[in-house]
Amino acid sequence: MSESPSWMAKVEKIANDVAAAQGCVLYDIEFVGLGKGRTLRLFIDREEEGAISIEDCTNVSRGLSEILDADEEMIPGGEYNLEVSTPGLDRHLKKPWHFKKAIGKKVYIKTTKALESVGVEDKKWKNAKTVEEVLESADEQGVRFVVKDVEIKIPYAMIDRAKLVFEYTKGQKK
């Protein structure tokens, strides 16, 4: 991950506080675009299980807008749009707590090196740089999958990108 500008770190701290005041947690923040198309995007979630409502997004947006609009110098470069939403069904996983929340769900991970570099010897997996399987566990060091008796441990430092995989399951007819 790249270093954020210092103003972005300030905005992230404020966004964390505003989200917490609404009973939410800041899942991720990004600033994208150029000129009048610049957008500050916040993704909020619950630390534990539970859904984020439109009202939660609205309250966080209003609370943050109030603070940012009071100090026009906080975000350099003039106009920007503010978007507040949930991370979505196929959310990106970046922080250890994101992975912990995804335990028992299917995730996609792209690594920076082949899996043999972390001790995977299985013929099918040792040269792989991607895994799309159900996440068995996650801790502060990395993640763990077990696929047909093959254990795959991947440290966070080796993860290039990761996301939750949405699996559509068709409902049963009654």
UniProtKB/Swiss-Prot annotation:
Transcription in keyword set: no
GO terms (BP aspect): ribosomal small subunit assembly; translation
Cellular component, GO annotation: cytosol
HAMAP family: RimP
Keyword Coiled coil: no
Protein name listed in UniProt: Ribosome maturation factor RimP
Organism ancestry: Bacteria, Pseudomonadati, Bdellovibrionota, Bdellovibrionia, Bdellovibrionales
SUPFAM superfamilies assigned to the protein according to its UniProt record, in alphabetical order: YhbC-like, C-terminal domain, YhbC-like, N-terminal domain
Domain of life: Bacteria
Keywords carried by this UniProt record: Cytoplasm, Ribosome biogenesis
Compartments reported by the entry: Cytoplasm
Chain's role: Required for maturation of 30S ribosomal subunits.
Family affiliation: Belongs to the RimP family.
Organism, as annotated: Bdellovibrio bacteriovorus (strain ATCC 15356 / DSM 50701 / NCIMB 9529 / HD100)
